[in-house]
């Protein structure tokens, strides 16, 4: 996949940053939203990420596995749909990255001209490099794993939260079906958006820079966040 020059955020968007979008009326500004996303937001009366609420006008809290806690300002935002991520990106004058851009930022080492299996290199994931395997039961604060950064300095690209991309889930050129074709092939070209990077709940043996996940644009999964590109 070819990419031209682009910039990618060094970290996923945080709760602190996303709260500014909420407080600036981002959920009321139709011009920021994809038309289908605006219709969904109106029908569902969406005003903030899933499980966010205000116990009083001055504080935001969230629910995590049935427990209520203050919003963790420097943790990656979660419970946002693709439409919400896209609207936020427009609000900050950016966009969501394509999956090719995301993969290049995670994989390419410009000093050697080679691709890495993981952002930090080809060594297997461990607790110093990424938040995986349900060990923390939540994402860490952004930047908590400097040893896991990519050659370009982007952190948190493996683990913590899956990340929305701008790309539709479709077959690569020359794709040949896995023997279990129902794993991915039947989902191609049906409106799914590509997710990359794994989450804090992903098994280490199941993730790599090239792994593709997917979901509907309206889904607000617990384990999904995003970062922006420009």
Regions found by a protein language model. Name each.
Residues 183-187, 213-220:
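Short proline/glycine-enriched turn/loop segments at secondary-structure junctions
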Residues 1, 11, 27-209:
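Functional-site microenvironments in short loops/helix caps that host divalent-cation chemistry
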Residues 222-230:
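Short, structured beta-strand segments at or near domain termini in extracellular proteins/domains
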